[in-house]
Amino acid sequence: MNLIDWFVLIFTISIIVIYGTWKNRINLNLKDYLKAGNRANWWTIGLSVMATQASAITFLSTPGQAYSEGMGFIQFYFGLPFAVIIICIFFIPVYTKLKVFTAYQFLENRFDRKTRILTASLFLIQRGLAAGITIYAPAIILSVVLNWNLKFLIILIGFSVILYTAIGGTRALNSTHKIQMFIMISGMFIALFYIIGSLPENINTEKALKIAGLNGKLNLLDFSFDINNRYTFWSGITGGFFLALSYFGTDQSQVQRYLSGKSLRESQMGLLMNAILKIPMQFLILLVGVFVFIFYQFQIAPIHFNPKAISEIKSSNKSSIFNKIEYDNYKTQNEKIKILRHNDFLESKEMQNEFLKLEKEEKNQREKVKNIIDQNLTDVESNDKDYVFISFILNYLPIGLVGLLLAVILSAAMSSTSSELNALTSTTVIDLYKPTYPNKSESHYLKMSKIFTFMWGIIAIIFANISSLFENLIQLINIIGSIFYGTILGVFLVAIFIKKIKSNSIFYAAIISEVIIIILFISDLFGYLWLNLFGAIFTIILSLFFSLFNSKNQ
Protein backbone atom coordinates (compact mmCIF):
# COMPACT_ATOMS: atom_id res chain seq x y z
CA MET A 1 0.00 0.00 0.00
CA ASN A 2 1.04 3.59 -0.66
CA LEU A 3 1.93 5.95 2.22
CA ILE A 4 -1.21 7.99 1.48
CA ASP A 5 -3.34 4.85 1.93
CA TRP A 6 -1.63 4.13 5.24
CA PHE A 7 -2.29 7.70 6.35
CA VAL A 8 -5.99 7.53 5.40
CA LEU A 9 -6.41 4.15 7.13
CA ILE A 10 -4.57 5.03 10.35
CA PHE A 11 -6.10 8.51 10.57
CA THR A 12 -9.65 7.19 10.12
CA ILE A 13 -9.35 4.39 12.68
CA SER A 14 -7.53 6.67 15.16
CA ILE A 15 -10.30 9.27 14.96
CA ILE A 16 -12.89 6.61 15.82
CA VAL A 17 -10.95 5.25 18.81
CA ILE A 18 -9.85 8.63 20.20
CA TYR A 19 -13.24 10.29 19.70
CA GLY A 20 -15.14 7.40 21.28
CA THR A 21 -12.75 7.21 24.23
CA TRP A 22 -12.38 10.94 24.97
CA LYS A 23 -15.92 12.18 24.40
CA ASN A 24 -17.50 9.51 26.61
CA ARG A 25 -14.80 8.91 29.21
CA ILE A 26 -17.05 9.97 32.13
CA ASN A 27 -19.90 7.65 33.16
CA LEU A 28 -21.47 8.51 36.50
CA ASN A 29 -23.45 5.32 37.01
CA LEU A 30 -24.58 2.02 35.50
CA LYS A 31 -27.45 3.68 33.62
CA ASP A 32 -24.97 6.04 31.95
CA TYR A 33 -22.61 3.20 31.09
CA LEU A 34 -25.09 0.59 29.82
CA LYS A 35 -28.01 2.75 28.59
CA ALA A 36 -26.23 6.02 27.70
CA GLY A 37 -28.34 7.73 30.35
CA ASN A 38 -31.40 7.27 28.11
CA ARG A 39 -30.39 10.33 26.09
CA ALA A 40 -30.16 8.87 22.55
CA ASN A 41 -32.39 10.36 19.84
CA TRP A 42 -34.04 8.27 17.14
CA TRP A 43 -31.50 8.80 14.37
CA THR A 44 -28.60 7.99 16.71
CA ILE A 45 -30.40 4.75 17.63
CA GLY A 46 -31.10 3.97 13.96
CA LEU A 47 -27.47 4.44 12.91
CA SER A 48 -26.24 2.45 15.92
CA VAL A 49 -28.60 -0.44 15.11
CA MET A 50 -27.38 -0.47 11.50
CA ALA A 51 -23.70 -0.22 12.51
CA THR A 52 -24.12 -3.12 14.93
CA GLN A 53 -25.52 -5.34 12.19
CA ALA A 54 -23.02 -4.21 9.53
CA SER A 55 -19.97 -6.29 10.41
CA ALA A 56 -16.79 -6.47 8.34
CA ILE A 57 -18.20 -9.70 6.93
CA THR A 58 -21.00 -7.61 5.38
CA PHE A 59 -18.51 -5.56 3.37
CA LEU A 60 -16.19 -8.44 2.54
CA SER A 61 -18.60 -11.29 1.84
CA THR A 62 -21.68 -9.56 0.42
CA PRO A 63 -19.99 -8.11 -2.71
CA GLY A 64 -18.37 -11.52 -3.26
CA GLN A 65 -21.78 -13.19 -2.86
CA ALA A 66 -23.21 -10.93 -5.57
CA TYR A 67 -20.15 -11.47 -7.78
CA SER A 68 -20.60 -15.24 -7.62
CA GLU A 69 -24.35 -15.75 -7.32
CA GLY A 70 -26.03 -12.43 -8.04
CA MET A 71 -28.50 -10.29 -6.10
CA GLY A 72 -30.63 -13.13 -4.72
CA PHE A 73 -29.11 -12.74 -1.23
CA ILE A 74 -31.30 -9.63 -0.81
CA GLN A 75 -34.24 -12.01 -0.14
CA PHE A 76 -32.58 -12.84 3.20
CA TYR A 77 -33.83 -9.44 4.48
CA PHE A 78 -37.41 -9.51 3.19
CA GLY A 79 -38.87 -10.50 6.56
CA LEU A 80 -37.00 -7.77 8.45
CA PRO A 81 -39.44 -4.83 8.05
CA PHE A 82 -42.40 -6.95 9.23
CA ALA A 83 -40.40 -8.20 12.22
CA VAL A 84 -39.42 -4.66 13.21
CA ILE A 85 -43.05 -3.49 13.11
CA ILE A 86 -44.05 -6.28 15.51
CA ILE A 87 -41.13 -5.44 17.81
CA CYS A 88 -42.11 -1.76 17.86
CA ILE A 89 -45.74 -2.59 18.70
CA PHE A 90 -45.26 -5.37 21.25
CA PHE A 91 -41.64 -5.72 22.47
CA ILE A 92 -40.33 -2.18 22.96
CA PRO A 93 -43.34 -0.95 25.00
CA VAL A 94 -42.84 -3.87 27.44
CA TYR A 95 -39.10 -3.17 27.82
CA THR A 96 -39.71 0.56 28.24
CA LYS A 97 -42.50 0.11 30.79
CA LEU A 98 -40.38 -2.21 32.95
CA LYS A 99 -37.27 0.03 32.53
CA VAL A 100 -35.08 -3.03 31.98
CA PHE A 101 -31.36 -2.97 31.21
CA THR A 102 -31.52 -6.26 29.28
CA ALA A 103 -34.25 -8.14 27.43
CA TYR A 104 -33.82 -11.11 29.76
CA GLN A 105 -34.84 -9.14 32.87
CA PHE A 106 -38.36 -9.16 31.47
CA LEU A 107 -38.39 -12.98 31.49
CA GLU A 108 -37.82 -13.16 35.25
CA ASN A 109 -40.68 -10.73 35.72
CA ARG A 110 -42.89 -12.91 33.51
CA PHE A 111 -41.60 -16.38 34.48
CA ASP A 112 -38.78 -16.93 36.97
CA ARG A 113 -35.04 -16.63 37.59
CA LYS A 114 -34.04 -19.92 35.91
CA THR A 115 -35.77 -18.99 32.62
CA ARG A 116 -34.00 -15.64 32.65
CA ILE A 117 -30.64 -17.32 33.29
CA LEU A 118 -31.27 -19.94 30.56
CA THR A 119 -32.03 -17.40 27.82
CA ALA A 120 -29.25 -15.08 28.97
CA SER A 121 -26.82 -18.02 28.88
CA LEU A 122 -27.92 -19.04 25.37
CA PHE A 123 -27.31 -15.46 24.28
CA LEU A 124 -23.87 -15.35 25.92
CA ILE A 125 -22.83 -18.59 24.18
CA GLN A 126 -23.86 -17.60 20.67
CA ARG A 127 -22.83 -13.94 20.92
CA GLY A 128 -19.55 -14.82 22.61
CA LEU A 129 -18.71 -17.09 19.65
CA ALA A 130 -19.87 -14.44 17.19
CA ALA A 131 -17.65 -11.78 18.79
CA GLY A 132 -14.59 -13.91 18.06
CA ILE A 133 -15.70 -14.56 14.50
CA THR A 134 -16.37 -10.86 13.76
CA ILE A 135 -12.74 -10.20 14.66
CA TYR A 136 -11.31 -13.31 12.98
CA ALA A 137 -13.15 -13.02 9.65
CA PRO A 138 -11.71 -9.68 8.48
CA ALA A 139 -8.35 -10.43 10.13
CA ILE A 140 -7.78 -13.69 8.23
CA ILE A 141 -8.71 -12.13 4.88
CA LEU A 142 -6.66 -8.97 5.40
CA SER A 143 -3.69 -11.00 6.64
CA VAL A 144 -3.73 -13.18 3.52
CA VAL A 145 -4.20 -10.36 1.05
CA LEU A 146 -1.95 -7.76 2.71
CA ASN A 147 0.56 -10.32 4.00
CA TRP A 148 0.16 -8.99 7.54
CA ASN A 149 0.60 -11.15 10.65
CA LEU A 150 -2.78 -12.67 11.57
CA LYS A 151 -2.29 -12.57 15.34
CA PHE A 152 -1.18 -8.93 15.15
CA LEU A 153 -4.33 -7.99 13.22
CA ILE A 154 -6.61 -9.84 15.65
CA ILE A 155 -4.99 -8.14 18.65
CA LEU A 156 -5.04 -4.73 16.91
CA ILE A 157 -8.76 -4.93 16.11
CA GLY A 158 -9.63 -6.47 19.48
CA PHE A 159 -7.78 -4.01 21.72
CA SER A 160 -8.87 -0.97 19.67
CA VAL A 161 -12.47 -1.96 20.33
CA ILE A 162 -11.88 -2.88 23.98
CA LEU A 163 -10.32 0.54 24.63
CA TYR A 164 -13.27 2.77 23.78
CA THR A 165 -15.97 0.22 24.67
CA ALA A 166 -14.59 -0.42 28.18
CA ILE A 167 -14.02 3.28 28.90
CA GLY A 168 -17.09 4.82 27.26
CA GLY A 169 -19.76 2.10 27.33
CA THR A 170 -22.96 2.56 25.34
CA ARG A 171 -22.45 6.31 24.92
CA ALA A 172 -19.10 5.63 23.23
CA LEU A 173 -20.77 3.13 20.91
CA ASN A 174 -23.54 5.56 19.95
CA SER A 175 -20.95 8.25 19.19
CA THR A 176 -18.57 6.08 17.18
CA HIS A 177 -21.34 4.25 15.32
CA LYS A 178 -22.42 7.52 13.67
CA ILE A 179 -18.90 8.11 12.35
CA GLN A 180 -18.51 4.47 11.32
CA MET A 181 -21.78 4.42 9.37
CA PHE A 182 -20.78 7.59 7.52
CA ILE A 183 -17.42 6.03 6.60
CA MET A 184 -19.00 2.71 5.55
CA ILE A 185 -21.80 4.10 3.37
CA SER A 186 -19.73 6.85 1.75
CA GLY A 187 -16.96 4.32 1.04
CA MET A 188 -19.35 1.97 -0.77
CA PHE A 189 -20.87 4.80 -2.85
CA ILE A 190 -17.40 6.00 -3.84
CA ALA A 191 -16.40 2.45 -4.80
CA LEU A 192 -19.56 2.02 -6.90
CA PHE A 193 -19.08 5.29 -8.79
CA TYR A 194 -15.40 4.53 -9.37
CA ILE A 195 -16.19 1.10 -10.85
CA ILE A 196 -18.86 2.56 -13.15
CA GLY A 197 -16.38 5.22 -14.28
CA SER A 198 -13.73 2.55 -14.94
CA LEU A 199 -15.82 0.57 -17.44
CA PRO A 200 -15.05 0.91 -21.18
CA GLU A 201 -16.32 4.14 -22.75
CA ASN A 202 -18.95 2.38 -24.85
CA ILE A 203 -20.41 0.58 -21.78
CA ASN A 204 -22.82 2.83 -19.91
CA THR A 205 -24.73 1.81 -16.78
CA GLU A 206 -27.68 0.46 -18.77
CA LYS A 207 -25.49 -1.75 -20.95
CA ALA A 208 -23.51 -2.90 -17.92
CA LEU A 209 -26.68 -4.03 -16.15
CA LYS A 210 -27.83 -5.85 -19.30
CA ILE A 211 -24.55 -7.79 -19.29
CA ALA A 212 -25.08 -8.61 -15.60
CA GLY A 213 -28.65 -9.69 -16.35
CA LEU A 214 -27.46 -11.94 -19.16
CA ASN A 215 -25.26 -13.70 -16.59
CA GLY A 216 -28.16 -14.10 -14.15
CA LYS A 217 -26.72 -11.64 -11.61
CA LEU A 218 -29.87 -9.51 -11.36
CA ASN A 219 -32.28 -12.29 -10.40
CA LEU A 220 -33.64 -10.76 -7.20
CA LEU A 221 -36.50 -13.17 -6.54
CA ASP A 222 -36.68 -16.94 -6.32
CA PHE A 223 -40.22 -18.22 -5.71
CA SER A 224 -39.25 -21.90 -5.67
CA PHE A 225 -40.26 -24.00 -2.66
CA ASP A 226 -36.94 -25.86 -2.39
CA ILE A 227 -36.34 -26.00 1.38
CA ASN A 228 -32.63 -26.75 0.78
CA ASN A 229 -32.17 -23.48 -1.11
CA ARG A 230 -30.84 -20.94 1.40
CA TYR A 231 -32.14 -17.79 -0.25
CA THR A 232 -35.66 -17.78 -1.67
CA PHE A 233 -38.56 -15.38 -1.30
CA TRP A 234 -40.24 -17.83 1.07
CA SER A 235 -37.19 -18.50 3.27
CA GLY A 236 -36.62 -14.74 3.54
CA ILE A 237 -40.21 -13.87 4.34
CA THR A 238 -40.56 -16.69 6.91
CA GLY A 239 -37.15 -17.83 8.19
CA GLY A 240 -35.73 -14.34 7.68
CA PHE A 241 -38.73 -12.89 9.52
CA PHE A 242 -38.15 -15.10 12.56
CA LEU A 243 -34.40 -14.47 12.47
CA ALA A 244 -34.97 -10.69 12.41
CA LEU A 245 -37.69 -10.93 15.08
CA SER A 246 -35.30 -12.76 17.39
CA TYR A 247 -32.25 -10.68 16.48
CA PHE A 248 -33.82 -7.25 16.88
CA GLY A 249 -36.31 -8.22 19.57
CA THR A 250 -34.31 -10.49 21.90
CA ASP A 251 -30.59 -10.19 21.07
CA GLN A 252 -29.07 -7.83 23.63
CA SER A 253 -26.57 -6.44 21.11
CA GLN A 254 -29.56 -4.87 19.31
CA VAL A 255 -31.97 -4.42 22.23
CA GLN A 256 -29.34 -2.36 24.05
CA ARG A 257 -29.17 0.07 21.14
CA TYR A 258 -32.81 1.13 21.45
CA LEU A 259 -32.99 0.80 25.24
CA SER A 260 -30.77 3.91 25.29
CA GLY A 261 -33.53 6.00 23.70
CA LYS A 262 -34.94 9.17 25.28
CA SER A 263 -38.45 7.80 25.10
CA LEU A 264 -40.59 4.97 23.76
CA ARG A 265 -41.22 6.94 20.57
CA GLU A 266 -37.52 7.65 19.98
CA SER A 267 -36.69 3.95 20.43
CA GLN A 268 -39.45 2.88 18.03
CA MET A 269 -38.52 5.45 15.39
CA GLY A 270 -34.85 4.46 15.61
CA LEU A 271 -35.63 0.81 14.95
CA LEU A 272 -38.09 1.71 12.18
CA MET A 273 -35.30 3.71 10.54
CA ASN A 274 -33.38 0.45 10.24
CA ALA A 275 -36.45 -1.31 8.78
CA ILE A 276 -36.65 1.36 6.07
CA LEU A 277 -32.94 1.63 5.23
CA LYS A 278 -31.57 -1.89 5.76
CA ILE A 279 -32.74 -3.43 2.46
CA PRO A 280 -31.58 -0.42 0.36
CA MET A 281 -28.21 -0.55 2.14
CA GLN A 282 -27.79 -4.27 1.39
CA PHE A 283 -28.96 -3.62 -2.18
CA LEU A 284 -26.17 -1.05 -2.54
CA ILE A 285 -23.52 -3.45 -1.23
CA LEU A 286 -24.76 -6.26 -3.49
CA LEU A 287 -24.85 -3.86 -6.44
CA VAL A 288 -21.20 -3.02 -5.82
CA GLY A 289 -20.47 -6.76 -6.09
CA VAL A 290 -22.42 -6.99 -9.37
CA PHE A 291 -20.43 -4.08 -10.81
CA VAL A 292 -17.18 -5.72 -9.70
CA PHE A 293 -18.36 -8.72 -11.74
CA ILE A 294 -19.07 -6.45 -14.74
CA PHE A 295 -15.66 -4.79 -14.32
CA TYR A 296 -13.95 -8.19 -14.49
CA GLN A 297 -15.80 -9.01 -17.71
CA PHE A 298 -13.43 -6.53 -19.37
CA GLN A 299 -10.33 -7.48 -17.36
CA ILE A 300 -8.53 -10.77 -16.80
CA ALA A 301 -9.78 -11.93 -13.40
CA PRO A 302 -7.74 -14.28 -11.19
CA ILE A 303 -8.84 -17.88 -11.62
CA HIS A 304 -9.03 -17.98 -7.81
CA PHE A 305 -9.13 -14.89 -5.57
CA ASN A 306 -7.41 -16.36 -2.50
CA PRO A 307 -3.70 -15.58 -3.06
CA LYS A 308 -2.59 -18.00 -0.33
CA ALA A 309 -4.35 -20.89 -2.10
CA ILE A 310 -2.77 -19.99 -5.45
CA SER A 311 0.68 -19.66 -3.91
CA GLU A 312 0.49 -23.04 -2.18
CA ILE A 313 -0.89 -24.85 -5.24
CA LYS A 314 1.92 -23.43 -7.39
CA SER A 315 4.42 -24.77 -4.84
CA SER A 316 2.83 -28.24 -4.75
CA ASN A 317 3.08 -31.27 -7.04
CA LYS A 318 -0.16 -30.11 -8.70
CA SER A 319 1.45 -26.98 -10.11
CA SER A 320 1.63 -28.28 -13.69
CA ILE A 321 -2.08 -29.22 -13.68
CA PHE A 322 -2.96 -25.83 -12.19
CA ASN A 323 -0.82 -23.93 -14.72
CA LYS A 324 -2.58 -25.72 -17.60
CA ILE A 325 -6.04 -24.82 -16.21
CA GLU A 326 -4.93 -21.23 -15.56
CA TYR A 327 -3.64 -20.87 -19.13
CA ASP A 328 -6.88 -22.28 -20.57
CA ASN A 329 -8.83 -19.89 -18.34
CA TYR A 330 -6.75 -16.97 -19.60
CA LYS A 331 -7.65 -17.86 -23.21
CA THR A 332 -11.33 -18.29 -22.30
CA GLN A 333 -11.49 -14.88 -20.65
CA ASN A 334 -9.77 -13.25 -23.62
CA GLU A 335 -12.35 -14.76 -25.98
CA LYS A 336 -15.15 -13.42 -23.75
CA ILE A 337 -13.64 -9.92 -23.71
CA LYS A 338 -13.38 -9.88 -27.52
CA ILE A 339 -17.07 -10.77 -27.85
CA LEU A 340 -18.16 -8.23 -25.21
CA ARG A 341 -16.27 -5.40 -26.87
CA HIS A 342 -18.17 -5.94 -30.12
CA ASN A 343 -20.62 -3.07 -30.64
CA ASP A 344 -23.47 -5.42 -31.63
CA PHE A 345 -23.08 -7.78 -28.67
CA LEU A 346 -26.31 -6.81 -26.87
CA GLU A 347 -28.32 -7.11 -30.11
CA SER A 348 -26.82 -10.38 -31.35
CA LYS A 349 -28.30 -13.59 -29.92
CA GLU A 350 -25.57 -15.57 -31.64
CA MET A 351 -22.79 -13.64 -29.85
CA GLN A 352 -24.67 -13.82 -26.55
CA ASN A 353 -24.99 -17.60 -26.85
CA GLU A 354 -21.27 -17.89 -27.62
CA PHE A 355 -20.50 -15.65 -24.64
CA LEU A 356 -22.64 -17.78 -22.30
CA LYS A 357 -20.94 -20.92 -23.59
CA LEU A 358 -17.55 -19.40 -22.72
CA GLU A 359 -18.91 -18.26 -19.34
CA LYS A 360 -19.92 -21.85 -18.55
CA GLU A 361 -16.49 -23.06 -19.63
CA GLU A 362 -14.83 -20.50 -17.36
CA LYS A 363 -16.96 -21.62 -14.38
CA ASN A 364 -15.90 -25.22 -14.99
CA GLN A 365 -12.25 -24.15 -15.00
CA ARG A 366 -12.72 -22.32 -11.69
CA GLU A 367 -14.42 -25.38 -10.19
CA LYS A 368 -11.48 -27.55 -11.24
CA VAL A 369 -9.14 -25.23 -9.33
CA LYS A 370 -11.40 -25.37 -6.26
CA ASN A 371 -11.40 -29.16 -6.43
CA ILE A 372 -7.59 -29.20 -6.55
CA ILE A 373 -7.49 -26.93 -3.48
CA ASP A 374 -10.03 -29.07 -1.59
CA GLN A 375 -8.16 -32.28 -2.35
CA ASN A 376 -4.63 -31.05 -1.68
CA LEU A 377 -4.76 -28.10 0.75
CA THR A 378 -6.65 -29.10 3.88
CA ASP A 379 -5.83 -25.86 5.73
CA VAL A 380 -6.92 -23.47 2.94
CA GLU A 381 -10.49 -22.42 2.16
CA SER A 382 -11.43 -23.12 -1.47
CA ASN A 383 -14.41 -20.75 -1.36
CA ASP A 384 -12.91 -17.47 -2.56
CA LYS A 385 -16.04 -15.25 -2.50
CA ASP A 386 -14.78 -13.33 0.54
CA TYR A 387 -11.57 -12.38 -1.28
CA VAL A 388 -13.22 -10.93 -4.41
CA PHE A 389 -13.86 -7.39 -3.18
CA ILE A 390 -10.65 -6.96 -1.18
CA SER A 391 -8.66 -8.23 -4.19
CA PHE A 392 -10.37 -5.64 -6.41
CA ILE A 393 -9.70 -2.88 -3.85
CA LEU A 394 -5.98 -3.59 -3.64
CA ASN A 395 -5.39 -4.15 -7.36
CA TYR A 396 -7.57 -1.55 -9.06
CA LEU A 397 -8.56 1.31 -6.75
CA PRO A 398 -6.42 4.47 -6.88
CA ILE A 399 -4.18 5.74 -4.08
CA GLY A 400 -6.22 7.05 -1.16
CA LEU A 401 -9.32 5.01 -1.98
CA VAL A 402 -7.51 1.81 -0.99
CA GLY A 403 -6.95 3.22 2.50
CA LEU A 404 -10.55 4.45 2.69
CA LEU A 405 -12.05 1.07 1.72
CA LEU A 406 -9.80 -0.76 4.18
CA ALA A 407 -11.02 1.73 6.79
CA VAL A 408 -14.58 0.77 5.82
CA ILE A 409 -13.82 -2.90 6.51
CA LEU A 410 -12.05 -2.25 9.82
CA SER A 411 -14.74 0.25 10.91
CA ALA A 412 -17.36 -2.41 10.30
CA ALA A 413 -15.36 -4.96 12.30
CA MET A 414 -15.05 -2.49 15.17
CA SER A 415 -18.71 -1.40 15.14
CA SER A 416 -20.15 -4.90 15.33
CA THR A 417 -17.56 -6.19 17.81
CA SER A 418 -18.00 -3.20 20.15
CA SER A 419 -21.78 -3.76 20.25
CA GLU A 420 -21.25 -7.44 21.00
CA LEU A 421 -18.85 -6.71 23.87
CA ASN A 422 -21.21 -4.07 25.25
CA ALA A 423 -24.15 -6.51 25.13
CA LEU A 424 -22.14 -9.38 26.62
CA THR A 425 -21.12 -7.08 29.47
CA SER A 426 -24.64 -5.85 30.24
CA THR A 427 -26.04 -9.39 30.18
CA THR A 428 -23.25 -10.72 32.40
CA VAL A 429 -23.56 -7.89 34.95
CA ILE A 430 -27.35 -7.43 35.01
CA ASP A 431 -28.55 -11.01 34.53
CA LEU A 432 -25.82 -13.05 36.24
CA TYR A 433 -23.49 -10.99 38.46
CA LYS A 434 -25.88 -8.49 40.07
CA PRO A 435 -28.49 -11.11 41.14
CA THR A 436 -25.66 -13.22 42.59
CA TYR A 437 -24.04 -10.27 44.40
CA PRO A 438 -26.91 -7.89 45.27
CA ASN A 439 -26.75 -4.75 47.45
CA LYS A 440 -23.37 -3.61 46.14
CA SER A 441 -22.74 0.06 45.40
CA GLU A 442 -23.42 1.65 42.00
CA SER A 443 -19.70 2.34 41.59
CA HIS A 444 -18.96 -1.35 42.21
CA TYR A 445 -21.29 -2.50 39.40
CA LEU A 446 -19.87 0.20 37.11
CA LYS A 447 -16.34 -1.02 37.84
CA MET A 448 -17.36 -4.64 37.24
CA SER A 449 -18.98 -3.66 33.92
CA LYS A 450 -15.65 -2.31 32.69
CA ILE A 451 -13.85 -5.42 33.95
CA PHE A 452 -16.34 -7.72 32.18
CA THR A 453 -16.00 -5.69 28.96
CA PHE A 454 -12.25 -6.26 29.10
CA MET A 455 -12.77 -9.95 29.96
CA TRP A 456 -15.17 -10.58 27.06
CA GLY A 457 -12.81 -8.71 24.74
CA ILE A 458 -9.94 -10.99 25.74
CA ILE A 459 -12.17 -14.07 25.27
CA ALA A 460 -13.13 -12.83 21.78
CA ILE A 461 -9.45 -12.30 20.90
CA ILE A 462 -8.54 -15.78 22.18
CA PHE A 463 -11.37 -17.41 20.22
CA ALA A 464 -10.41 -15.44 17.11
CA ASN A 465 -6.85 -16.75 17.47
CA ILE A 466 -7.97 -20.40 17.62
CA SER A 467 -10.63 -19.99 14.92
CA SER A 468 -8.24 -21.26 12.26
CA LEU A 469 -8.79 -24.73 13.74
CA PHE A 470 -12.31 -24.70 12.28
CA GLU A 471 -13.71 -24.57 8.75
CA ASN A 472 -15.79 -21.90 7.01
CA LEU A 473 -16.07 -19.57 10.01
CA ILE A 474 -16.45 -16.56 7.74
CA GLN A 475 -19.84 -17.93 6.66
CA LEU A 476 -21.05 -18.83 10.15
CA ILE A 477 -22.30 -15.59 11.73
CA ASN A 478 -25.93 -16.03 10.67
CA ILE A 479 -25.76 -19.81 11.05
CA ILE A 480 -24.66 -19.55 14.69
CA GLY A 481 -27.46 -17.07 15.34
CA SER A 482 -30.01 -19.35 13.69
CA ILE A 483 -29.08 -22.26 15.98
CA PHE A 484 -30.04 -20.25 19.08
CA TYR A 485 -32.37 -17.46 17.96
CA GLY A 486 -35.46 -19.60 17.31
CA THR A 487 -35.55 -21.04 20.83
CA ILE A 488 -34.94 -17.66 22.48
CA LEU A 489 -37.62 -16.07 20.30
CA GLY A 490 -40.09 -18.82 21.20
CA VAL A 491 -39.59 -18.03 24.90
CA PHE A 492 -40.27 -14.32 24.31
CA LEU A 493 -43.32 -14.96 22.11
CA VAL A 494 -44.83 -17.16 24.82
CA ALA A 495 -43.97 -14.55 27.46
CA ILE A 496 -45.72 -11.75 25.57
CA PHE A 497 -48.65 -13.49 23.88
CA ILE A 498 -49.56 -16.68 25.81
CA LYS A 499 -50.20 -15.60 29.38
CA LYS A 500 -51.43 -18.95 30.72
CA ILE A 501 -48.07 -20.74 30.28
CA LYS A 502 -46.01 -20.89 33.48
CA SER A 503 -42.28 -20.97 34.14
CA ASN A 504 -41.55 -24.72 34.27
CA SER A 505 -43.41 -25.39 31.02
CA ILE A 506 -41.44 -22.81 29.04
CA PHE A 507 -38.13 -23.67 30.72
CA TYR A 508 -38.18 -27.36 29.77
CA ALA A 509 -39.72 -26.60 26.36
CA ALA A 510 -36.79 -24.28 25.58
CA ILE A 511 -34.18 -26.86 26.60
CA ILE A 512 -35.76 -29.65 24.51
CA SER A 513 -36.31 -27.32 21.55
CA GLU A 514 -32.66 -26.26 21.57
CA VAL A 515 -31.52 -29.90 21.60
CA ILE A 516 -33.79 -30.66 18.61
CA ILE A 517 -32.48 -27.64 16.68
CA ILE A 518 -28.86 -28.66 17.28
CA ILE A 519 -29.67 -32.18 16.01
CA LEU A 520 -31.38 -30.72 12.90
CA PHE A 521 -28.39 -28.48 12.27
CA ILE A 522 -25.93 -31.37 12.53
CA SER A 523 -28.10 -33.51 10.22
CA ASP A 524 -28.00 -30.70 7.61
CA LEU A 525 -31.52 -31.45 6.38
CA PHE A 526 -32.60 -27.82 5.93
CA GLY A 527 -31.21 -24.43 4.97
CA TYR A 528 -30.16 -22.66 8.17
CA LEU A 529 -32.79 -19.88 7.93
CA TRP A 530 -35.52 -22.44 8.59
CA LEU A 531 -33.97 -23.26 11.99
CA ASN A 532 -35.24 -19.90 13.28
CA LEU A 533 -38.81 -20.82 12.38
CA PHE A 534 -38.53 -24.39 13.68
CA GLY A 535 -36.92 -23.31 16.97
CA ALA A 536 -39.69 -20.84 17.73
CA ILE A 537 -42.46 -23.28 16.76
CA PHE A 538 -40.97 -26.18 18.75
CA THR A 539 -40.63 -23.99 21.85
CA ILE A 540 -44.21 -22.74 21.63
CA ILE A 541 -45.77 -26.16 20.91
CA LEU A 542 -43.76 -27.93 23.62
CA SER A 543 -44.60 -25.26 26.19
CA LEU A 544 -48.31 -25.63 25.36
CA PHE A 545 -48.00 -29.41 25.68
CA PHE A 546 -46.24 -29.21 29.06
CA SER A 547 -48.75 -26.62 30.26
CA LEU A 548 -51.67 -28.87 29.26
CA PHE A 549 -49.99 -31.90 30.86
CA ASN A 550 -49.39 -30.03 34.12
CA SER A 551 -52.95 -28.71 34.27
CA LYS A 552 -54.36 -32.23 33.80
CA ASN A 553 -52.14 -33.58 36.58
CA GLN A 554 -53.30 -30.81 38.88
Identify the meaning behind each predicted range:
Residues 1-554:
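Membrane-embedded helix-loop-helix hairpins and adjacent transmembrane boundary segments
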